[in-house]
UniProtKB/Swiss-Prot annotation:
N-glycosylated. GO terms for molecular function: unfolded protein binding. Residues 1-33 form the signal peptide. Glycans are attached at residue 195. This is Endoplasmic reticulum lectin 1. It comes from Mus musculus (Mouse). It is found in: Endoplasmic reticulum lumen. The gene is Erlec1. May form a complex with OS9, HSPA5, SYVN1, and SEL1L with which it interacts directly. Interacts (via PRKCSH 2 domain) with KREMEN2 (when glycosylated). Interacts with HSPA5. GO terms for cellular component: endoplasmic reticulum lumen.
């Protein structure tokens, strides 16, 4: 909600300003009720004065669709409300065309597949058939090795049953499920797939997925995202133009809906209390000036908690990736704490998160309000084991500069002796790859995990902080404080 003439603003649609108005005003108007407000529909209150004409384009308005609002100071306002949903409801009511399953039928009959290529995994969605996650390893003179998981399958009889069941459900119910896509609640058509590759973390129960088809007029059935919402249960979002002819699945922008409140005779342009509130906000906007002593960072400054977020739509992230912002300690102090293992990096989105403490351990964990924290030890540090590993593997990789000099591009460390794996009956192990990350934020850290073989992991850690210590790596890739 925001005010139309540049006054009070709020980032939450339908939030503080309307709440303030509800607290200041009471409604009357011969049986009219306050509108049903939703955070999905943004509103903006305008105070246009007495000389005013309603907009003739965009959102519809009617002169008789208003509420008389009275403040605690007996100020009265006539607030004209937008007809937010009337046009859409009429279109949906008149629709007699194919149901969403029938609209998607050509996609299922074509035996077409969509792909999403990421840094390690490739995702294959063969519509109405299966979802596959795979990685190909090709070695010189040898055949291609494929590491794959099926995230869901759909047999022909299941497809027929699904078609009949969902068609009946659509006739009975008008509720369309929605998903938050880039901040907008977007309707989707779900297709369930089960019978995937057995999941060792769930007593070998099969993996399963929900494919969410959403309308996008200019798309070509692309895979927008793949997410593991719980252990071995996935959500796959597909963009398709086929649903766009159905009014309930149409892509709609969320314009700001204006509410126009005009003062009635004897009342001021705006409510007194609202004007006082605006004046208070203006005072708070005056920059707070600190003296020089306060500008200095405190030695006891607490670290900020980790903030995990998904990669923006349109990028090519790995399956599990997170970005965290670390504290504003000086770089030297931060490097010391990182190398001592007392400062740990955290990352990951979705069900599992990851903790990496240099020279100590790599943990995979999930926190739940009801069941507490579930943690899996992926690997623990043993310098002797790492040195033996480094004799057979590349622990220090170089980058050749334009002037012919070499700089360390990445170091790899081996962490073994993790928890026993149900599939292999061997301890889990992980190779940690530390890379320099160029970023505008000097304290940004990206952490991601791959599983190229069962219970054998790769943990990628990228940060500008690592840039400053890579060149200290010895022949075994071990790091130290820079001079």
């Amino acid at each position: 909600m925001e005010e139309g003439d540049g006054g009070l603003r709020s980032l939450v649609p339908g939030g503080p300003l309307l709440l303030v108005l509800y607290g200041l005003l009471e409604a009357s108007g011969g049986g009219r009720a306050l509108p049903q407000l939703s955070d999905d529909i943004p509103f903006r209150v305008n105070w246009p004065g007495t000389e005013f004409s309603l907009p003739t384009t965009g959102v519809l308005y009617k002169e008789d669709n208003y509420i008389i609002m009275t403040t605690a100071h007996k100020e009265k306002y006539k607030c004209i409300l937008p007809l937010v949903t009337s046009g859409d409801e009429e279109e949906e009511k008149d629709y007699k065309g194919p149901n969403p399953r029938e609209l998607l039928e050509p996609l299922f009959k074509q035996s077409s597949c969509s792909y999403r290529i990421e840094s390690y995994w490739t995702y294959e969605v063969c519509h109405g058939k299966h979802i596959r996650q795979y990685h190909e390893e090709k070695e010189t003179g040898q055949k291609v090795n494929i590491h794959e998981y099926y995230l869901g399958n759909m047999l022909a009889k299941n497809l027929l049953y699904e078609k009949e069941r969902e068609a009946k459900e659509n006739e009975k119910s008008n509720e369309i499920p929605t998903k938050n896509i880039e901040g907008q609640m977007t309707p989707y058509y779900p297709v369930g797939m089960g019978n995937g590759t057995p999941c060792s973390l769930k007593q070998n129960r099969p993996r399963s997925s929900t494919v969410m088809y959403i309308c996008h007029p200019e798309s070509k059935h692309e895979i927008l995202s793949v997410a593991e919402v719980t252990t071995c249960e996935y959500e796959v979002v597909i963009l398709t133009p086929l649903l766009c002819s159905h009014p309930k699945y149409k892509f709609r922008a969320s314009p700001v809906n204006d509410i126009f409140c005009q003062s009635l005779p004897g009342s001021p342009f705006k409510p007194l209390t609202l004007r006082q509130l605006e004046q208070q906000e203006e005072i708070l906007r005056v920059p707070f000036r600190r003296n020089k002593e306060e500008d200095l960072p405190s030695a006891k400054e607490e670290r900020f908690p980790a903030i995990h977020k998904p990669i923006a739509v349109g990028s090519q992230p790995v399956l599990t990736v997170g970005t965290t912002h670390i504290s504003k300690l000086t770089d030297d102090q931060l490097i010391k704490e990182f190398l001592s293992g007392s400062y740990c990096f955290h990352g990951g989105v979705g069900w599992w998160k990851y903790e990496f403490c240099y020279g100590k351990h790599v943990h995979q964990y999930h926190e739940d309000k009801d069941n507490g924290k579930t943690s899996v030890v992926v690997g623990t540090w043993n310098q002797e084991e790492h040195v033996e590993w480094a004799k057979k593997n590349t622990a220090r990789a170089y980058h050749l500069q334009d002037d012919g000099t070499q700089t360390v591009r990445m170091v790899s460390h081996f962490y073994g002796n993790g928890d026993i794996c149900d599939i292999t009956d061997k301890p889990r192990q992980v190779t940690v790859k530390l890379k320099c990350k160029e970023s505008d934020s000097p304290h940004a850290v990206t952490v991601y995990m791959l599983e190229p073989h069962s219970c054998q992991y790769i943990l990628g850690v990228e940060s500008p902080v690592i840039c400053k210590i890579l060149d200290t790596a010895d022949e075994n890739g071990l790091l130290s404080l820079p001079n």
